[in-house]
Design a protein with these regions (language model features):
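N-terminal intrinsically disordered/low-complexity leader segments
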Residues: 1-23, 206
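N-terminal positioning helix adjacent to the helix-turn-helix/winged-helix DNA-binding module
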Residues: 24-27, 31, 142
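Helix-turn-helix
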Residues: 27, 35-69
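Short hydrophobic clusters on alpha-helical segments that form packing/core surfaces
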Residues: 28-36, 78, 82, 109
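Amphipathic alpha-helical linker/stalk segments
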Residues: 74-101
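Amphipathic alpha-helical packing segments from all-alpha helical-bundle domains
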Residues: 80, 84, 100-115, 129-154, ...
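Hydrophobic/aromatic-rich alpha-helical bundle segments in the mid-to-C-terminal region
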Residues: 121-125, 132, 153-198, 205
């Protein structure tokens, strides 16, 4: 009887405990985002994140084993938002040419990166293998979607290989990296060169 009563009391506490745990995880991610945006990648240590969130370092390990787990979770959050924006754009296409389609995709990414410096810090400065794999997976998914979109709408030749769009994302990443190393808002001249390079490359299959 006593065991059953204790179990019931434990079950009643569970939703509250879970809610507090979720709130703390959000607080940690928000603190990490703020530190990355204000002070850069190197400053966003697990200790600094905990201090910003008001959570003792020892307690931080209950939610995230190390800073890389925090970074990965925060990057996933950014990727979810980016995916939502890309999906909305592809579902209501306005681009009438390949160049316009390339511009639209670049603008989505550029606008988001400029508004979320923490994302650029993780995407381009963070070199942990976990982040690298997340970026690669995201790019592969988006490249597949964009390739189908371009071919289905006749904006790219049906002979355009999927690999060409995948490589375009790879090149785009490198040029975005250069652009944001040049200026905090992303160097416009470098972005313009990215537009020309990627468009010319994909048009070569026409």
């Amino acid at each position: 009887v006593f065991e059953n009563s204790a179990a019931i009391r434990g079950q009643k506490r569970t939703p509250g405990v879970q809610r507090r745990g979720q709130e703390r995880r959000r607080a940690i991610l928000d603190a990490a985002e703020a530190l990355l945006a204000e002070q850069g990648y190197e400053a966003a240590t697990l200790k600094a994140i905990g201090e910003r969130a008001g959570i003792p370092t020892a307690s931080m390990y209950h939610y995230f084993p190390d800073r890389h787990q925090v970074e990965a979770e925060l990057l996933r959050r950014h990727m979810t938002e980016l995916d939502t924006r890309i999906t909305a754009t592809l579902e209501k296409p306005e681009a009438q040419t390949l160049r316009e389609a390339v511009d639209v995709m670049i603008d989505i990414l550029w606008d988001y990166y400029r508004a979320h410096r923490s994302c650029t810090e993780l995407w381009f400065t963070g070199r942990h293998q976990m982040l690298v794999e997340l970026v690669r997976s995201f790019d592969d998914v988006q490249a597949e979607r964009l390739w189908r979109h371009l071919v289905n709408r006749g904006l790219a030749s049906a002979d355009t290989p999927r690999l060409a769009v995948q490589l375009s994302f790879e090149v785009g990443n490198r040029l975005f990296d250069v652009a944001f190393r040049r200026t905090p808002q992303g160097d416009g001249a470098t972005i313009d060169e990215a537009r020309r390079l990627i468009t010319a490359y994909l048009e070569s299959y026409s």
